[in-house]
Protein backbone atom coordinates (compact mmCIF):
# COMPACT_ATOMS: atom_id res chain seq x y z
CA UNK A 1 0.00 0.00 0.00
CA UNK A 2 2.82 2.37 0.92
CA UNK A 3 4.56 1.53 -2.36
CA UNK A 4 1.44 2.44 -4.37
CA UNK A 5 1.11 5.80 -2.57
CA UNK A 6 4.77 6.62 -3.19
CA UNK A 7 4.49 5.75 -6.89
CA UNK A 8 1.39 7.90 -7.19
CA UNK A 9 3.24 10.88 -5.72
CA UNK A 10 6.22 10.62 -8.08
CA UNK A 11 4.63 12.66 -10.93
CA UNK A 12 3.70 15.41 -8.46
CA UNK A 13 7.22 15.52 -7.01
CA UNK A 14 8.72 15.67 -10.48
CA UNK A 15 6.44 18.53 -11.44
CA UNK A 16 7.34 20.42 -8.27
CA UNK A 17 11.07 19.97 -8.88
CA UNK A 18 10.78 21.13 -12.50
CA UNK A 19 8.75 24.25 -11.68
CA UNK A 20 10.72 27.35 -12.63
CA UNK A 21 10.94 29.63 -9.56
CA UNK A 22 11.43 32.67 -11.79
CA UNK A 23 8.87 34.91 -13.49
CA UNK A 24 9.76 36.43 -16.85
CA UNK A 25 9.09 39.67 -18.70
CA UNK A 26 8.24 39.47 -21.51
CA UNK A 27 6.31 36.44 -20.35
CA UNK A 28 7.10 33.10 -21.94
CA UNK A 29 5.11 32.90 -25.15
CA UNK A 30 4.22 36.61 -25.08
CA UNK A 31 3.14 38.25 -28.33
CA UNK A 32 3.06 41.90 -29.34
CA UNK A 33 6.28 42.78 -27.51
CA UNK A 34 7.99 46.10 -28.24
CA UNK A 35 11.43 45.59 -29.83
CA UNK A 36 13.04 48.00 -27.33
CA UNK A 37 12.06 45.82 -24.37
CA UNK A 38 14.38 44.97 -21.54
CA UNK A 39 14.39 41.38 -20.30
CA UNK A 40 13.32 41.12 -16.67
CA UNK A 41 13.56 38.14 -14.34
CA UNK A 42 11.95 38.20 -10.91
CA UNK A 43 13.42 35.67 -8.47
CA UNK A 44 12.04 34.37 -5.17
CA UNK A 45 15.08 35.93 -3.46
CA UNK A 46 17.88 38.30 -4.44
CA UNK A 47 20.09 36.79 -7.17
CA UNK A 48 23.81 37.41 -7.55
CA UNK A 49 25.42 38.44 -10.82
CA UNK A 50 28.06 36.03 -12.09
CA UNK A 51 31.40 37.01 -13.58
CA UNK A 52 31.24 34.95 -16.77
CA UNK A 53 28.85 33.36 -19.23
CA UNK A 54 26.58 34.66 -21.96
CA UNK A 55 23.07 35.93 -22.40
CA UNK A 56 21.97 35.44 -26.00
CA UNK A 57 18.92 36.29 -28.07
CA UNK A 58 18.17 34.17 -31.14
CA UNK A 59 15.86 34.57 -34.09
CA UNK A 60 13.55 31.60 -33.57
CA UNK A 61 12.88 31.17 -37.30
CA UNK A 62 16.45 31.26 -38.59
CA UNK A 63 18.35 30.22 -35.48
CA UNK A 64 20.70 33.19 -35.91
CA UNK A 65 22.07 34.85 -32.79
CA UNK A 66 20.97 38.48 -32.98
CA UNK A 67 22.49 39.67 -29.70
CA UNK A 68 25.02 38.43 -27.19
CA UNK A 69 26.05 39.82 -23.80
CA UNK A 70 29.39 38.59 -22.45
CA UNK A 71 29.38 38.79 -18.66
CA UNK A 72 33.16 38.40 -18.50
CA UNK A 73 33.52 41.99 -19.76
CA UNK A 74 33.34 44.71 -17.09
CA UNK A 75 30.55 47.24 -17.45
CA UNK A 76 32.85 50.26 -17.51
CA UNK A 77 35.60 52.12 -15.71
CA UNK A 78 35.42 52.51 -11.94
CA UNK A 79 38.42 54.83 -11.49
CA UNK A 80 39.34 58.07 -13.23
CA UNK A 81 41.86 57.68 -15.99
CA UNK A 82 44.89 59.89 -16.55
CA UNK A 83 45.07 62.29 -19.49
CA UNK A 84 48.34 63.50 -20.96
CA UNK A 85 49.27 66.92 -22.38
CA UNK A 86 48.33 65.70 -25.86
CA UNK A 87 44.64 65.70 -24.85
CA UNK A 88 43.11 68.93 -26.15
CA UNK A 89 39.99 70.37 -27.72
CA UNK A 90 39.31 69.46 -31.33
CA UNK A 91 40.69 71.92 -33.87
CA UNK A 92 37.52 71.60 -35.97
CA UNK A 93 33.87 71.67 -34.82
CA UNK A 94 32.20 68.31 -34.27
CA UNK A 95 30.23 67.17 -37.33
CA UNK A 96 26.64 66.16 -36.47
CA UNK A 97 25.59 65.47 -40.05
CA UNK A 98 24.73 61.89 -41.01
CA UNK A 99 23.33 60.14 -44.07
CA UNK A 100 21.84 57.34 -41.96
CA UNK A 101 21.37 56.71 -38.26
CA UNK A 102 24.07 54.32 -37.02
CA UNK A 103 22.95 51.51 -34.72
CA UNK A 104 24.45 48.37 -33.24
CA UNK A 105 22.97 46.55 -36.24
CA UNK A 106 24.80 48.47 -38.96
CA UNK A 107 27.86 49.92 -37.20
CA UNK A 108 30.56 48.50 -34.96
CA UNK A 109 30.30 50.04 -31.46
CA UNK A 110 33.42 52.06 -30.79
CA UNK A 111 33.69 53.43 -34.32
CA UNK A 112 35.20 56.89 -33.78
CA UNK A 113 33.42 60.11 -34.65
CA UNK A 114 34.86 63.60 -34.88
CA UNK A 115 38.56 63.59 -34.01
CA UNK A 116 38.33 60.84 -31.38
CA UNK A 117 40.26 57.60 -31.36
CA UNK A 118 38.34 54.28 -31.49
CA UNK A 119 36.72 53.34 -28.19
CA UNK A 120 38.33 50.15 -26.81
CA UNK A 121 36.04 47.12 -26.85
CA UNK A 122 37.46 45.57 -23.68
CA UNK A 123 34.35 46.59 -21.73
CA UNK A 124 30.63 46.63 -22.40
CA UNK A 125 29.85 48.99 -25.27
CA UNK A 126 26.65 49.93 -27.06
CA UNK A 127 25.60 52.56 -29.58
CA UNK A 128 22.82 54.80 -28.26
CA UNK A 129 21.10 57.46 -30.33
CA UNK A 130 23.51 57.01 -33.22
CA UNK A 131 26.62 57.95 -31.19
CA UNK A 132 29.01 55.44 -32.78
CA UNK A 133 31.80 55.88 -30.22
CA UNK A 134 29.47 54.02 -27.88
CA UNK A 135 28.48 54.06 -24.23
CA UNK A 136 29.62 51.81 -21.42
CA UNK A 137 26.61 50.14 -19.81
CA UNK A 138 25.55 47.48 -17.35
CA UNK A 139 24.30 44.37 -19.19
CA UNK A 140 22.40 43.31 -16.08
CA UNK A 141 21.14 45.49 -13.23
CA UNK A 142 19.85 43.85 -10.06
CA UNK A 143 17.57 45.54 -7.54
CA UNK A 144 16.46 43.32 -4.68
CA UNK A 145 15.06 40.16 -6.33
CA UNK A 146 14.65 41.65 -9.82
CA UNK A 147 17.32 41.29 -12.52
CA UNK A 148 16.94 43.45 -15.62
CA UNK A 149 18.86 42.50 -18.75
CA UNK A 150 19.78 45.27 -21.20
CA UNK A 151 20.19 44.02 -24.77
CA UNK A 152 22.29 46.16 -27.09
CA UNK A 153 20.07 48.92 -28.47
CA UNK A 154 18.20 48.58 -31.77
CA UNK A 155 18.95 44.92 -32.51
CA UNK A 156 15.46 43.44 -32.11
CA UNK A 157 13.00 44.07 -34.93
CA UNK A 158 9.25 44.16 -35.50
CA UNK A 159 7.52 41.02 -36.71
CA UNK A 160 10.04 38.53 -35.36
CA UNK A 161 10.03 35.53 -33.03
CA UNK A 162 12.88 35.31 -30.52
CA UNK A 163 14.12 33.05 -27.78
CA UNK A 164 16.58 33.83 -24.99
CA UNK A 165 19.27 31.65 -23.47
CA UNK A 166 21.11 32.36 -20.23
CA UNK A 167 24.17 30.33 -19.31
CA UNK A 168 24.26 28.71 -15.86
CA UNK A 169 26.14 30.95 -13.46
CA UNK A 170 25.19 34.23 -15.11
CA UNK A 171 22.51 34.76 -12.48
CA UNK A 172 22.94 32.80 -9.28
CA UNK A 173 19.89 32.00 -7.21
CA UNK A 174 18.74 28.78 -5.57
CA UNK A 175 16.73 26.68 -8.00
CA UNK A 176 17.76 28.66 -11.09
CA UNK A 177 20.15 27.02 -13.56
CA UNK A 178 19.90 29.38 -16.47
CA UNK A 179 17.54 29.35 -19.44
CA UNK A 180 17.88 26.73 -22.16
CA UNK A 181 17.08 26.96 -25.84
CA UNK A 182 13.38 27.34 -26.51
CA UNK A 183 12.36 27.81 -22.87
CA UNK A 184 11.86 31.58 -23.08
CA UNK A 185 10.20 32.64 -26.32
CA UNK A 186 8.36 35.79 -27.32
CA UNK A 187 7.33 37.59 -30.49
CA UNK A 188 7.47 41.29 -31.28
CA UNK A 189 4.73 43.50 -32.66
CA UNK A 190 4.10 43.16 -36.38
CA UNK A 191 4.96 46.80 -37.01
CA UNK A 192 5.61 50.13 -35.34
CA UNK A 193 3.00 52.66 -34.20
CA UNK A 194 0.60 53.92 -36.84
CA UNK A 195 0.60 57.45 -35.43
CA UNK A 196 4.25 58.44 -35.57
CA UNK A 197 3.64 61.94 -34.21
CA UNK A 198 1.98 60.78 -30.97
CA UNK A 199 4.05 58.14 -29.20
CA UNK A 200 3.55 56.49 -25.82
CA UNK A 201 6.13 54.96 -23.50
CA UNK A 202 5.31 52.52 -20.69
CA UNK A 203 7.78 50.34 -18.83
CA UNK A 204 5.23 47.52 -18.62
CA UNK A 205 5.04 47.24 -22.41
CA UNK A 206 1.55 48.68 -22.76
CA UNK A 207 2.71 51.66 -24.83
CA UNK A 208 4.29 52.06 -28.24
CA UNK A 209 7.70 51.72 -26.59
CA UNK A 210 9.10 50.40 -23.32
CA UNK A 211 11.89 52.98 -23.13
CA UNK A 212 12.28 56.71 -23.60
CA UNK A 213 15.24 56.02 -25.88
CA UNK A 214 13.13 53.79 -28.08
CA UNK A 215 10.61 56.58 -28.62
CA UNK A 216 13.30 59.16 -29.39
CA UNK A 217 14.93 56.78 -31.86
CA UNK A 218 11.63 56.72 -33.75
CA UNK A 219 11.70 60.49 -34.31
CA UNK A 220 13.34 61.46 -37.64
CA UNK A 221 16.27 63.85 -37.55
CA UNK A 222 15.30 67.53 -37.83
CA UNK A 223 11.59 66.74 -38.08
CA UNK A 224 9.54 69.85 -38.84
CA UNK A 225 6.34 68.41 -37.35
CA UNK A 226 5.88 68.23 -33.59
CA UNK A 227 6.23 64.78 -32.04
CA UNK A 228 4.45 64.24 -28.72
CA UNK A 229 5.97 61.56 -26.50
CA UNK A 230 3.93 60.64 -23.42
CA UNK A 231 5.81 58.69 -20.77
CA UNK A 232 3.62 56.81 -18.28
CA UNK A 233 4.27 56.77 -14.56
CA UNK A 234 7.08 54.39 -13.77
CA UNK A 235 10.79 53.88 -13.29
CA UNK A 236 12.91 54.06 -16.45
CA UNK A 237 16.50 53.03 -15.72
CA UNK A 238 18.30 53.78 -18.96
CA UNK A 239 20.84 56.07 -20.56
CA UNK A 240 19.00 58.47 -22.84
CA UNK A 241 20.98 60.17 -25.61
CA UNK A 242 19.37 61.90 -28.58
CA UNK A 243 20.92 64.05 -31.27
CA UNK A 244 19.54 66.07 -34.18
CA UNK A 245 15.97 65.92 -32.82
CA UNK A 246 13.68 68.92 -33.23
CA UNK A 247 10.11 69.82 -32.28
CA UNK A 248 9.60 67.16 -29.63
CA UNK A 249 7.47 67.38 -26.47
CA UNK A 250 8.24 64.73 -23.82
CA UNK A 251 5.62 64.59 -21.06
CA UNK A 252 5.68 62.46 -17.93
CA UNK A 253 3.00 61.85 -15.32
CA UNK A 254 4.61 64.21 -12.79
CA UNK A 255 8.03 64.68 -11.24
CA UNK A 256 7.05 62.29 -8.42
CA UNK A 257 5.61 59.69 -10.81
CA UNK A 258 7.85 59.38 -13.88
CA UNK A 259 11.58 58.94 -13.26
CA UNK A 260 14.28 58.47 -15.91
CA UNK A 261 17.68 57.69 -14.41
CA UNK A 262 20.96 55.81 -14.74
CA UNK A 263 24.27 55.39 -12.92
CA UNK A 264 26.45 57.42 -15.29
CA UNK A 265 29.31 59.89 -14.82
CA UNK A 266 32.66 60.99 -16.26
CA UNK A 267 34.46 57.99 -14.77
CA UNK A 268 32.05 55.41 -16.19
CA UNK A 269 31.73 57.07 -19.62
CA UNK A 270 34.76 59.37 -19.96
CA UNK A 271 35.72 61.60 -22.85
CA UNK A 272 38.29 60.25 -25.34
CA UNK A 273 41.93 60.07 -24.31
CA UNK A 274 42.97 62.64 -26.91
CA UNK A 275 39.94 64.95 -27.06
CA UNK A 276 38.54 67.20 -24.34
CA UNK A 277 34.87 67.99 -24.12
CA UNK A 278 32.31 70.46 -22.65
CA UNK A 279 34.20 73.76 -22.88
CA UNK A 280 33.79 75.19 -26.38
CA UNK A 281 31.01 75.34 -28.98
CA UNK A 282 31.54 72.49 -31.41
CA UNK A 283 33.39 70.40 -28.86
CA UNK A 284 33.25 66.60 -28.80
CA UNK A 285 29.94 65.48 -27.22
CA UNK A 286 29.86 64.23 -23.65
CA UNK A 287 28.66 60.72 -22.77
CA UNK A 288 28.55 61.11 -18.99
CA UNK A 289 24.95 62.31 -18.52
CA UNK A 290 22.00 60.13 -17.58
CA UNK A 291 19.87 62.05 -20.11
CA UNK A 292 21.33 64.13 -22.94
CA UNK A 293 19.76 66.15 -25.74
CA UNK A 294 22.61 66.93 -28.12
CA UNK A 295 22.26 69.30 -31.06
CA UNK A 296 18.50 69.32 -30.46
CA UNK A 297 16.25 72.36 -30.91
CA UNK A 298 12.68 73.26 -29.95
CA UNK A 299 12.28 70.58 -27.28
CA UNK A 300 9.97 70.54 -24.25
CA UNK A 301 10.45 68.33 -21.20
CA UNK A 302 7.67 68.43 -18.63
CA UNK A 303 6.32 66.60 -15.59
CA UNK A 304 9.12 64.13 -14.95
CA UNK A 305 12.23 63.46 -12.89
CA UNK A 306 15.63 63.01 -14.56
CA UNK A 307 18.53 61.77 -12.46
CA UNK A 308 21.97 60.26 -12.38
CA UNK A 309 22.65 57.69 -9.68
CA UNK A 310 26.40 58.40 -9.38
CA UNK A 311 28.58 61.12 -7.85
CA UNK A 312 31.39 63.12 -9.43
CA UNK A 313 31.13 64.96 -12.72
CA UNK A 314 27.68 63.59 -13.35
CA UNK A 315 24.90 65.39 -15.17
CA UNK A 316 21.37 64.32 -14.57
CA UNK A 317 20.48 66.35 -17.67
CA UNK A 318 22.79 67.68 -20.39
CA UNK A 319 21.33 70.09 -22.93
CA UNK A 320 22.90 71.34 -26.14
CA UNK A 321 20.46 73.15 -28.36
CA UNK A 322 18.24 76.15 -28.90
CA UNK A 323 14.81 76.82 -27.39
CA UNK A 324 14.64 73.96 -24.91
CA UNK A 325 11.91 74.31 -22.28
CA UNK A 326 11.75 72.58 -18.90
CA UNK A 327 8.42 72.63 -17.07
CA UNK A 328 7.87 70.92 -13.71
CA UNK A 329 11.03 68.87 -14.12
CA UNK A 330 13.12 67.63 -11.20
CA UNK A 331 16.79 67.16 -12.11
CA UNK A 332 19.07 65.22 -9.78
CA UNK A 333 22.79 65.09 -10.39
CA UNK A 334 26.12 65.60 -8.71
CA UNK A 335 28.75 68.05 -9.93
CA UNK A 336 27.39 69.70 -13.10
CA UNK A 337 23.94 68.29 -12.33
CA UNK A 338 22.54 70.41 -15.18
CA UNK A 339 24.71 71.27 -18.15
CA UNK A 340 23.07 74.03 -20.18
CA UNK A 341 24.37 74.93 -23.63
CA UNK A 342 22.18 76.95 -25.99
CA UNK A 343 19.00 78.73 -24.88
CA UNK A 344 17.16 77.03 -22.02
CA UNK A 345 13.95 78.06 -20.25
CA UNK A 346 13.14 76.50 -16.88
CA UNK A 347 9.87 77.01 -14.97
CA UNK A 348 8.38 75.50 -11.80
CA UNK A 349 11.22 73.00 -11.70
CA UNK A 350 13.81 71.68 -9.23
CA UNK A 351 17.54 71.07 -9.47
CA UNK A 352 19.39 69.02 -6.85
CA UNK A 353 23.13 68.44 -6.99
CA UNK A 354 26.58 69.08 -5.62
CA UNK A 355 29.05 71.91 -6.24
CA UNK A 356 28.98 73.55 -9.69
CA UNK A 357 25.37 72.41 -9.83
CA UNK A 358 24.90 74.22 -13.15
CA UNK A 359 27.61 74.13 -15.79
CA UNK A 360 27.41 75.52 -19.26
CA UNK A 361 28.31 78.02 -21.90
CA UNK A 362 24.68 78.71 -22.79
CA UNK A 363 21.85 80.90 -21.57
CA UNK A 364 19.49 79.72 -18.83
CA UNK A 365 16.38 81.63 -17.76
CA UNK A 366 14.76 80.16 -14.64
CA UNK A 367 11.39 81.22 -13.23
CA UNK A 368 9.71 79.99 -10.03
CA UNK A 369 12.24 77.17 -9.65
CA UNK A 370 14.14 75.71 -6.70
CA UNK A 371 17.85 74.93 -6.52
CA UNK A 372 19.43 72.75 -3.85
CA UNK A 373 23.02 71.64 -3.36
CA UNK A 374 25.19 70.17 -0.63
CA UNK A 375 27.25 73.30 -0.19
CA UNK A 376 29.45 75.33 -2.51
CA UNK A 377 28.81 77.10 -5.81
CA UNK A 378 25.58 76.63 -7.70
CA UNK A 379 27.16 77.48 -11.03
CA UNK A 380 30.28 77.77 -13.12
CA UNK A 381 28.81 79.89 -15.87
CA UNK A 382 30.86 80.20 -19.07
CA UNK A 383 28.82 82.26 -21.50
CA UNK A 384 30.51 84.46 -24.09
CA UNK A 385 28.97 87.74 -25.25
CA UNK A 386 26.66 88.56 -26.90
CA UNK A 387 24.94 85.53 -25.33
CA UNK A 388 23.58 86.01 -21.83
CA UNK A 389 24.45 83.65 -18.99
CA UNK A 390 22.13 82.47 -16.19
CA UNK A 391 19.17 84.55 -15.01
CA UNK A 392 16.91 83.61 -12.11
CA UNK A 393 13.58 85.30 -11.32
CA UNK A 394 11.58 84.47 -8.19
CA UNK A 395 13.60 81.32 -7.51
CA UNK A 396 14.96 79.69 -4.36
CA UNK A 397 18.56 78.68 -3.54
CA UNK A 398 19.43 76.42 -0.61
CA UNK A 399 22.52 74.71 0.79
CA UNK A 400 22.81 72.58 3.93
CA UNK A 401 23.18 73.49 7.61
CA UNK A 402 26.90 74.04 8.17
CA UNK A 403 27.57 73.75 4.42
CA UNK A 404 26.34 76.99 2.90
CA UNK A 405 25.79 77.34 -0.82
CA UNK A 406 26.62 80.33 -3.01
CA UNK A 407 25.52 81.55 -6.41
CA UNK A 408 28.65 80.41 -8.17
CA UNK A 409 32.18 80.97 -9.32
CA UNK A 410 33.90 82.12 -12.47
CA UNK A 411 37.49 81.46 -11.53
CA UNK A 412 40.20 80.54 -14.03
CA UNK A 413 40.04 77.01 -15.46
CA UNK A 414 43.53 76.11 -16.58
CA UNK A 415 44.36 78.73 -19.21
CA UNK A 416 40.74 79.79 -19.64
CA UNK A 417 39.07 82.76 -17.99
CA UNK A 418 35.45 83.92 -18.20
CA UNK A 419 35.34 87.71 -18.56
CA UNK A 420 31.78 87.66 -19.99
CA UNK A 421 30.27 85.40 -17.32
CA UNK A 422 26.79 86.53 -16.26
CA UNK A 423 24.68 85.44 -13.29
CA UNK A 424 21.66 87.55 -12.37
CA UNK A 425 19.33 86.98 -9.40
CA UNK A 426 16.06 88.91 -9.09
CA UNK A 427 13.50 88.58 -6.28
CA UNK A 428 14.79 85.22 -5.06
CA UNK A 429 15.05 83.58 -1.63
CA UNK A 430 18.01 81.87 0.04
CA UNK A 431 18.61 79.46 2.92
CA UNK A 432 21.95 78.19 4.34
CA UNK A 433 23.73 80.65 2.10
CA UNK A 434 27.23 82.13 1.93
CA UNK A 435 27.13 85.88 2.77
CA UNK A 436 29.65 86.49 -0.04
CA UNK A 437 26.96 85.54 -2.54
CA UNK A 438 29.58 84.44 -5.07
CA UNK A 439 32.52 82.40 -3.82
CA UNK A 440 34.82 83.49 -6.66
CA UNK A 441 34.53 85.98 -9.50
CA UNK A 442 37.62 85.70 -11.63
CA UNK A 443 37.21 88.81 -13.77
CA UNK A 444 35.99 92.26 -12.79
CA UNK A 445 34.18 92.49 -16.13
CA UNK A 446 31.83 89.63 -15.21
CA UNK A 447 28.16 90.58 -14.77
CA UNK A 448 27.06 89.41 -11.32
CA UNK A 449 23.85 91.19 -10.37
CA UNK A 450 21.35 90.78 -7.55
CA UNK A 451 18.13 92.49 -6.55
CA UNK A 452 15.43 91.85 -3.96
CA UNK A 453 16.87 88.72 -2.33
CA UNK A 454 15.09 87.65 0.86
CA UNK A 455 15.80 85.19 3.62
CA UNK A 456 13.55 82.16 3.08
CA UNK A 457 12.90 81.68 6.81
CA UNK A 458 12.24 85.24 7.95
CA UNK A 459 10.96 86.78 4.75
CA UNK A 460 13.18 89.76 5.45
CA UNK A 461 15.66 91.22 2.98
CA UNK A 462 18.86 89.19 2.94
CA UNK A 463 22.01 90.69 4.40
CA UNK A 464 24.03 91.57 1.31
CA UNK A 465 26.63 93.71 3.07
CA UNK A 466 29.38 91.09 2.54
CA UNK A 467 28.71 90.32 -1.12
CA UNK A 468 31.69 89.82 -3.44
CA UNK A 469 33.32 93.09 -4.49
CA UNK A 470 32.86 92.32 -8.19
CA UNK A 471 29.11 91.81 -7.80
CA UNK A 472 26.53 94.59 -7.83
CA UNK A 473 23.21 95.17 -6.12
CA UNK A 474 20.58 96.59 -8.44
CA UNK A 475 18.44 99.46 -7.18
CA UNK A 476 14.70 98.87 -7.83
CA UNK A 477 14.19 102.50 -8.87
CA UNK A 478 17.46 103.53 -10.46
CA UNK A 479 17.86 100.22 -12.30
CA UNK A 480 14.15 99.62 -13.02
CA UNK A 481 14.63 99.47 -16.79
CA UNK A 482 17.51 96.98 -16.55
CA UNK A 483 15.57 94.83 -14.08
CA UNK A 484 12.58 94.78 -16.43
CA UNK A 485 14.83 93.61 -19.24
CA UNK A 486 16.26 90.77 -17.16
CA UNK A 487 12.75 89.68 -16.15
CA UNK A 488 11.80 89.38 -19.83
CA UNK A 489 12.71 85.89 -21.14
CA UNK A 490 12.81 87.09 -24.74
CA UNK A 491 15.46 89.71 -23.92
CA UNK A 492 17.61 87.11 -22.18
CA UNK A 493 17.00 84.22 -24.61
CA UNK A 494 18.00 85.90 -27.87
CA UNK A 495 14.46 86.84 -28.89
CA UNK A 496 12.75 83.56 -27.98
CA UNK A 497 9.51 83.95 -26.02
CA UNK A 498 8.81 80.59 -24.36
CA UNK A 499 5.32 79.69 -23.24
CA UNK A 500 4.69 80.15 -19.53
CA UNK A 501 1.64 77.86 -19.51
CA UNK A 502 2.98 74.62 -20.98
Feature annotation, model-predicted:
Residues 2-8:
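Sec-dependent signal peptide recognition
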Residues 189-206, 210-502:
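Sequence-level preference for short, compositionally simple segments enriched
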